Amino acid sequence: MIKGIGLDMIDLERVKQVVEKNPRFIERVLTEKEIKQFEKYEGNRKIEFLAGRFAAKEAYAKANGTGFGKHLSFTDVEILQVEDGRPHVTLPVKSGENVFVSITHTARSAAAQVIIEI
């Protein structure tokens, strides 16, 4: 049974401007393990990665029905790339839940969809 579906989209230029103004934004959005993956990329690919993770985390919060705030923060949600290249939500998956995530990019935006199944 589906618990929730979340979808989010973000402009890459907006993310780039935020990072240029406040580089700590990266640490507010990404976990330590995600930062290690982020650091492997160069140039615009870094912005795509960050924007994709931001959108995926927003989509997760929407699918979970909580949004971000008191009960959930960006670094509570971890999305790592598995060996075959797919993004995989590793935190905070609850027992009995399956979480499916898809992240996509264009030249101007990143979008993500999350489905939580129980």
Curated annotation (Swiss-Prot):
Gene Ontology cellular component list: cytoplasm
Positions that bind Mg(2+): 8, 58
Residues passing through the membrane, by range: none
Entry's localization field: Cytoplasm
Function: Transfers the 4'-phosphopantetheine moiety from coenzyme A to a Ser of acyl-carrier-protein.
Family of the protein in this entry: Belongs to the P-Pant transferase superfamily. AcpS family.
Protein name from the UniProt record: Holo-[acyl-carrier-protein] synthase
Source organism per UniProt: Listeria monocytogenes serovar 1/2a (strain ATCC BAA-679 / EGD-e)
Lineage: Bacteria, Bacillati, Bacillota, Bacilli, Bacillales
UniProt gene name: acpS
